[in-house]
Amino acid sequence: MTRLFGTDGVRGLANRKLTALLALKLGAAAAEVLTKDNRSTSRRPVAVVGRDPRVSGEMLAAALSAGMASRGVDVLRVGVLPTPAVAYLTDFYGADMGVVISASHNPMPDNGIKFFSKGGHKLPDSVEDEIEKVMETIPDGGPTGHGIGRVIEEAVDAQETYLKHLKGAVPRSLEGITVVVDCANGAASEVAPLAYAAAGAKVIPIHNHPNAYNINDSCGSTHIDQVQAAVLEHGADLGLAHDGDADRCLAVDAEGNVVDGDQIMAILALAMKENGELHKSTLVATVMSNLGLRLAMKEAGIELRTTKVGDRYVLEELNAGGFSLGGEQSGHIVLPDHGTTGDGTLTGLSLMSRMAETGLSLKVLASAMTVLPQVLINVPVSDKTIIQTHPDVVAAMERASDELGEDGRVLLRPSGTEELFRVMVEAPSKETARRIAADLASVVAKI
């Protein structure tokens, strides 16, 4: 049986793979697993549920809430809010679990469901596996009468509570900084502009009018050209681009150059080390991070630890080691002293705070890391399980590694959310990286 959970919860085409019935069963099973140790006679368990603005979110939220209520869990619906806001509110309200209905950067027809445990923490694989097992055996019946959970619609203070948290996490004034923020017509559309303005920045929001159908539609962190053009048009100091659920942030400097998650981590790591905030002088990233990040950190006396791709694995390493900064090249940046998951708005505030602290432009700050040319090709495949061990692929990988030696690297890995294999090559020149990646991708495509 194929595993239901991917690298970031359950995700798929809404009303086909991710149906209301599946959401109902997931809600019931997750309620059983995540609240089994927190039940008492004095109160019912509580779940916080938020979503992004895509049209299927309302349907899935209703089904999911019904499933949890059927197992005796009170459901606090907080409406459209970023994923990190739901994680924070799960902890703030003392809830037993949290749920986000979002497919992040995926197209509007997709959706997803991801869970948080008590305290706002993402689930380890073992707990997700337990939820899947319970889904197969959970009975139709449940509590009756007073034992049935209530569904409380739209907690009125949820957004304001999250905004206060952001202000407290990054209190430095951003007065004098002009920022363009691309909200992807997603969960950041209200929160991000409000947070940046409250910190003192002049904010120029774009793609901040969600209508249930336009999330990630030629905008946001996967369409960085939109914020690049707006920064140049308005003469802004920088631009920030969020994804649909606002757990990631990419940046653009005043000249329109992209500053990706690796560069953002380099900037923040150096700042935190200087200020005595980088615990154990260690940064946590993934195997997809550019080789240039490792070289820059080595020069600064900072250890770089790498994990599998997925911010959940970065989080596990951060928690296990007691570290204070980690993230992904894609813009998922985690600051454990201020949150339990990647937070795009917090990242944007932290980046601008460093600009305000130093008086330096984003371009100058980003120059602390030299980015090695990198090419990434996504190859559609029918069976992800056979690719890496196929003799033709093994031989092609060996040829590429022999050619690059210590001057680059090759990485081949399956997507955790789509039927794709990702071919990534770093090399001294873009041309070399592109050629080697294309050769390897052609081999994978024939399998």
UniProtKB/Swiss-Prot annotation:
Binds 1 Mg(2+) ion per subunit. GO terms for molecular function: magnesium ion binding; phosphoglucosamine mutase activity; phosphomannomutase activity. Mg(2+) binds at residues 104, 243, 245, 247. PROSITE patterns: PGM_PMM. Transmembrane segments: none annotated. GO terms for cellular component: cytosol. The modification Phosphoserine is found at residue 104. InterPro entries: A-D-PHexomutase_a/b/a-I (IPR005844), A-D-PHexomutase_a/b/a-I/II/III (IPR016055), A-D-PHexomutase_a/b/a-II (IPR005845), A-D-PHexomutase_a/b/a-III (IPR005846), A-D-PHexomutase_C (IPR005843), A-D-PHexomutase_C_sf (IPR036900), A-D-PHexomutase_CS (IPR016066), Alpha-D-phosphohexomutase_SF (IPR005841). Its cofactor is Mg(2+). Catalyzes the conversion of glucosamine-6-phosphate to glucosamine-1-phosphate. This is Phosphoglucosamine mutase. It comes from Corynebacterium diphtheriae (strain ATCC 700971 / NCTC 13129 / Biotype gravis).
